[in-house]
Amino acid sequence: MKYFVVALALVAAFACIAESKPAESEHELAEVEEENELADLEDAVWLEHLADLSDLEEARGFFGNTWKKIKGKADKIMLKKAVKIMVKKEGITKEEAQAKVDAMSKKQIRLYLLKYYGKKALQKASEKL
């Protein structure tokens, strides 16, 4: 269970990176240059390097693709978990449980798993008290 939580945290981190703000535009850098009255050539070179931040766009694309892969694998794991839980909880065959899960939307599957693991966590917490 804790591996699932860690994986979920990583997915959230990748999503935040993928949704992050794009690099500053040349126009914004020109405004900064005017505000700071940069006369020094080294400062101007530094600002040019800031304007050439295409690596951030490439990284964002990489994390976006990675996010999609992780999300796909997480969805497959959730489907398998939902089938296992239904077989155990309802006492039906694996094929029947698979048919029920296939009929459910991804949102319904997530809610089903959250309810199951929420009840399980509540029971463990009440036992410790």
Curated annotation (Swiss-Prot):
Sorted alphabetically, which keywords does the UniProt record give?
Answer: Antibiotic, Antimicrobial, Cytolysis, Hemolysis, Secreted, Signal, Toxin
Q: What is this protein called?
A: M-zodatoxin-Lt8d
Taxonomically, the superkingdom here is Eukaryota
* Propeptide part(s) removed at maturation, as residue ranges: 21-60
One Gene Ontology term of the molecular function aspect: toxin activity
The written remark on domains in the entry is:
Both the N-terminus (61-94) and the C-terminus (99-129) of the mature peptide form alpha-helices which probably disrupt target cell membranes. The linker region (95-98) probably derives from a processing quadruplet motif (PQM), found in propeptides of many zodatoxins, hinting at a fusion of two originally separate membrane-active peptides.
Record InterPro entries: Latarcin_precursor
GO annotation (BP), single? defense response to Gram-positive bacterium
Please name the Pfam families in this protein's record.
Latarcin
| Annotated signal peptide | 1-20
Family of this protein: Belongs to the cationic peptide 06 (cytoinsectotoxin) family.
Record keyword Ribosomal protein present:
no
Q: What is the protein's known function?
A: Insecticidal, cytolytic and antimicrobial peptide. Forms voltage-dependent, ion-permeable channels in membranes. At high concentration causes cell membrane lysis.
Tissue distribution is:
Expressed by the venom gland.
The short sequence motif called Processing quadruplet motif sits at 57-60
Where, subcellularly, is it found? Answer: Secreted
What gene is it encoded by?
Answer: cit 1-4
